[in-house]
Structures are given as C-alpha cells and as structure tokens.
Amino acid sequence: MTQANNAVYTDLSVDDLVKEALNRGEGELADTGALVVRTGHRTGRSPVDRFIVEEPSTQAAIAWGPINRKFPADKFDALWARVEAFNNAQEHFVSHVHVGAAEDHYLAVKMTTQTAWQNLFGRCLFINPAQYNPAGREEWQVLNVANFECVPERDGTNSDGCVIINFAQKKVLIAGMRYAGEMKKAMFSVQNFLLPAADVLPMHCAANIGEEGDVTLFFGLSGTGKTTLSADESRYLIGDDEHGWGEGVVFNIEGGCYAKCIDLSEKNEPVIWKAIKHGAVLENVVIDDAKHADYADVSLTQNSRAAYPLEHVAKRSEKNLGGEPNAVIFLTCDLTGVLPPVSILNEEQAAYHFLSGYTALVGSTEMGSGSGIKSTFSTCFGAPFFPRPAGEYAELLIKRIRGFGSKVYLVNTGWTGGGYGVGKRFNIPTTRAVIAAIQSGALIGAATEHLDTINLDVPLAVPGVETNLLNPRNTWADKAAYDEAAKALAGLFIENFKKFEVSDAIKAAGPKL
C-alpha cells in the first residue's frame, strides 16, 4: 500500500495489518506465523505515568491517590491537541472496536495508533463486532502515539510517556508508550469506573463454562494462574482477564487474551500454545535464527506476552458471555508457604479476601518492581485498575454472591513445605486437580478442618490431590517454623486491613493473632 505520508489506514484486515507492520520494520514473523515485536525500555505497565482527568464527574467519585493520579483538564486538552497534531502529520491506523460483550454495556471505541502492530494488538484484545455501535452510542476515542515524547515541564506528565483517561470527553490518551498492555488496561479502567453505576461488578478475572453451563470465575493478579487455569481443554473459555457480572450474566469486557509467555509449554498450556499463530502478537519474546520462540529466555523481560483473539481458541463461548458463576475462585500466589492449596470461604471471608487481594508479584507486569518476587496486597485482585473506592466493588461482589448463591474458594498457586527459596511451588497438575474438584461440586458441603491463625477452613479430602498437602502445616519439616510464619502472615493481613471501613463481621473474617 503506497499512500501519502499522512495516510490514514482504516479498519484494515488482520492480514494487512501484519503486512504493514512487517513493511515498516515494526517486527518479524515467528515460525508459527505470529508477529514478534519489542517494546523498548518499557516492558510492562508504568503506573506512575497513569492519570485520570479531574473534572466534575470524577472529582468526588474517584479514590484519588498514588494509583489514581489527578491530571488537570486544561493540561489534558493542550497535550491531546499536541499529540493529535503530531500523529496527523504521519501515517497512522484506525480501527473501530467494542469494549464489553453485553449488548447493554458495550463501549464503541475509535482506536487510533501510530503503529500497525499496536492496532493489530487492539484488534486481538478488543471486540471486533459484526456491526459497529448498533445502539448509536457516543464514541470513545483512544489515541495511542508511541513515538511522541512528552516533556514533563511542558505537558504536566511524570516522564516522556503517559496514559491519561478523560471520562468527561470519553478520551484515552496514550503517548510515548510502546508496551501495548497500557491500551488494554486503560479501557479496562474505564469500564471499571462506568459499570458499577449500572449495577454491574467489573472484575479482574478469567471465566470459563462447563458442558452443563456452569460458570467459574478466576480472580488473581498477573502470574497467579488466571490465564493458564481458565484455558482448560475440557471447558469453554469466556475470557482470561476482564469481565462484568450483572444480574443473570457474566460477560467478557474483551475479545482476546493476553497470556504471559515465560516458560510456556505445549504440555502444560496447550490452549495458549495453539493460539500463538498468524494474527497473534508476541511481545518481548526472544526468537532464534530459525524464528523459533524461546519462552525460557527472559533476557528482555520476565513479562513476555502473547496477544491473540478468542477466535484462536477452539473451545470458547461463541457469545463471549455466560450465566452467573457457580464457583468464584480467588487465586493467590503465597510466597510464605502458609496458605493451603484450597480453602472454602463464607460471604464475610469472601469480602475480606477480595478487599485484601493478597498475592505475590511474580514476573511483574509493572515497571520498577524489579525481577524479585515479593508479597503484596492488591485490592480487588487488581488495585491499579479500579478507580472507585474499594468498598463499592466489595459491596457489589457480596450482592452478586448472595443473589446467585455462588460458592467462593481461596486457591494458593504459590509455595508449600516452606516459603520461597525453601519450599516448592504447587505444580500446575495439582492446582488443576483442585480446580476440577471445585467445578465438579465435590467440595460443596465437604468435611473441613479449621486453621486458627489464618482463620480458614480446609477440606479434609480433595479428589486427585494428596491429602498431606491440604493442611500446609503438615508439609513443613519444622512445624514451629510454620507456626511463626503463619503468625507473621496474619500480622501482614491485619495491618493491611486497617485501612478499610467495613462491618465487624468482615473484619473478623480474616487471620487472627
């Protein structure tokens, strides 16, 4: 395609976007046909560069602070105009997509990118509707210009790059950011602000459906197993990361998956493996001279990624949605080796652990977190993406669980037999057996044992799981060391939870000293 230097390529096919990316030297093809790209010095999200415009509709509704940073409306207008003029002077790409699979809750989005590969990424991750914006809703605009360099003194940004959401104008500005995950998570944050007003709980979770129509949700931070565990060849995938839960429905906010690639194997993750083909994007994955991906090579980043459309998954929900969930699973990667592989939660415990969002940063998606693995608390299992006060999401969760009668479980995909460096991590087959037991209903009404310090109820037997693994204390050679580690973890939970204004019943549902 030879056009003027400021040509606009609108709604190109996937094939043409791949060709344009290759013609521009934006990436190369792996032997699977996937487009391989590099994102420069940013190989993860940059939380310190993300802002929300402060204006009347957001002033009192946002939980402002280090996560949701204020940006002045006048500065936004000036920067948008500057970035738009820069982009309009050169070739760029436009696609029209939806964010939200439910008819009542989709956003119509005009996505403009400077690069062909980021447009392809958006086409992988967002929804490509048969008919664009049938309800004629006011359009959102995403302007993503990777080569623009912000000047903090002039633009009011924190660095040379920024992500700024303007709810009043329905605009998302992404400048100087090559890591495409910023675009996906920005629109997730938009829906996370809008959906609660429609009585829909937005969730950082994966979802799948069984043959009988039963739905399972998998909450968890990056690296805890959402994508891997939801990609189950025996079930139909709804989505791997972002969903809404309304009365009678769980729907995908996206139209694709964004899988971590570190140590990816065909044996352990066959669904993901098969999805990485023509039309998919590999971000910061090292390939050899034969164009074969080396998923064990972390020389670029531990946060290597594959973006692919749901159409690449053979067994999926054709409508991109399902009914309300029978099982709600909170995935936590416990570095301390204190938590059991599975616990059965009541409503108050569900609220407590949802608000706590305890896990580890594993191969973190955030810049500046380093390669080290460390424990963290991330409210709603996704604090960086939830603009409203946490209590609003927790109240909606309890309302939905109570209304449908969903069963809730805490599943540890982290360590056992000792903490990180001493014990070992639960292997994927063991965790899959736990998930299968939950989905079969085997744990409903099961006999349990109460673990006092961490205040959790553990089933005495789980089909397919060694019984000695169920009570974590049994897996430690030094029982006294386990008891001390449990007290230390309980202290972390208690300290973290002091910031929440909730009922005494929810406060009492957590660990105790």
Curated annotation (Swiss-Prot):
<dbReference type="GO" id="GO:0006094">
    <property type="term" value="P:gluconeogenesis"/>
</dbReference>
<keyword id="KW-0479">Metal-binding</keyword>
<keyword id="KW-0963">Cytoplasm</keyword>
<feature type="binding site">
    <location>
        <position position="185"/>
    </location>
    <ligand>
        <name>Mn(2+)</name>
    </ligand>
</feature>
<keyword id="KW-0464">Manganese</keyword>
<protein>
    <recommendedName>
        <fullName>Phosphoenolpyruvate carboxykinase (ATP)</fullName>
        <ecNumber>4.1.1.49</ecNumber>
    </recommendedName>
</protein>
<feature type="binding site">
    <location>
        <position position="185"/>
    </location>
    <ligand>
        <name>substrate</name>
    </ligand>
</feature>
<keyword id="KW-0312">Gluconeogenesis</keyword>
<comment type="function">
    <text>Involved in the gluconeogenesis. Catalyzes the conversion of oxaloacetate (OAA) to phosphoenolpyruvate (PEP) through direct phosphoryl transfer between the nucleoside triphosphate and OAA.</text>
</comment>
<feature type="binding site">
    <location>
        <position position="204"/>
    </location>
    <ligand>
        <name>ATP</name>
    </ligand>
</feature>
<feature type="binding site">
    <location>
        <position position="241"/>
    </location>
    <ligand>
        <name>Mn(2+)</name>
    </ligand>
</feature>
<feature type="binding site">
    <location>
        <position position="305"/>
    </location>
    <ligand>
        <name>ATP</name>
    </ligand>
</feature>
<feature type="binding site">
    <location>
        <position position="269"/>
    </location>
    <ligand>
        <name>ATP</name>
    </ligand>
</feature>
<comment type="pathway">
    <text>Carbohydrate biosynthesis; gluconeogenesis.</text>
</comment>
<feature type="binding site">
    <location>
        <position position="204"/>
    </location>
    <ligand>
        <name>Mn(2+)</name>
    </ligand>
</feature>
<keyword id="KW-0067">ATP-binding</keyword>
<keyword id="KW-0210">Decarboxylase</keyword>
<feature type="binding site">
    <location>
        <begin position="220"/>
        <end position="228"/>
    </location>
    <ligand>
        <name>ATP</name>
    </ligand>
</feature>
<keyword id="KW-0547">Nucleotide-binding</keyword>
<feature type="binding site">
    <location>
        <position position="45"/>
    </location>
    <ligand>
        <name>substrate</name>
    </ligand>
</feature>
<feature type="binding site">
    <location>
        <position position="179"/>
    </location>
    <ligand>
        <name>substrate</name>
    </ligand>
</feature>
<dbReference type="GO" id="GO:0004612">
    <property type="term" value="F:phosphoenolpyruvate carboxykinase (ATP) activity"/>
</dbReference>
<dbReference type="InterPro" id="IPR013035">
    <property type="entry name" value="PEP_carboxykinase_C"/>
</dbReference>
<feature type="binding site">
    <location>
        <position position="305"/>
    </location>
    <ligand>
        <name>substrate</name>
    </ligand>
</feature>
<dbReference type="InterPro" id="IPR015994">
    <property type="entry name" value="PEPCK_ATP_CS"/>
</dbReference>
<comment type="similarity">
    <text>Belongs to the phosphoenolpyruvate carboxykinase (ATP) family.</text>
</comment>
<feature type="binding site">
    <location>
        <position position="431"/>
    </location>
    <ligand>
        <name>ATP</name>
    </ligand>
</feature>
<dbReference type="GO" id="GO:0005829">
    <property type="term" value="C:cytosol"/>
</dbReference>
<dbReference type="Pfam" id="PF01293">
    <property type="entry name" value="PEPCK_ATP"/>
</dbReference>
<dbReference type="InterPro" id="IPR008210">
    <property type="entry name" value="PEP_carboxykinase_N"/>
</dbReference>
<keyword id="KW-0456">Lyase</keyword>
<comment type="subunit">
    <text>Monomer.</text>
</comment>
<dbReference type="GO" id="GO:0046872">
    <property type="term" value="F:metal ion binding"/>
</dbReference>
<dbReference type="InterPro" id="IPR001272">
    <property type="entry name" value="PEP_carboxykinase_ATP"/>
</dbReference>
<dbReference type="GO" id="GO:0005524">
    <property type="term" value="F:ATP binding"/>
</dbReference>
<feature type="binding site">
    <location>
        <position position="185"/>
    </location>
    <ligand>
        <name>ATP</name>
    </ligand>
</feature>
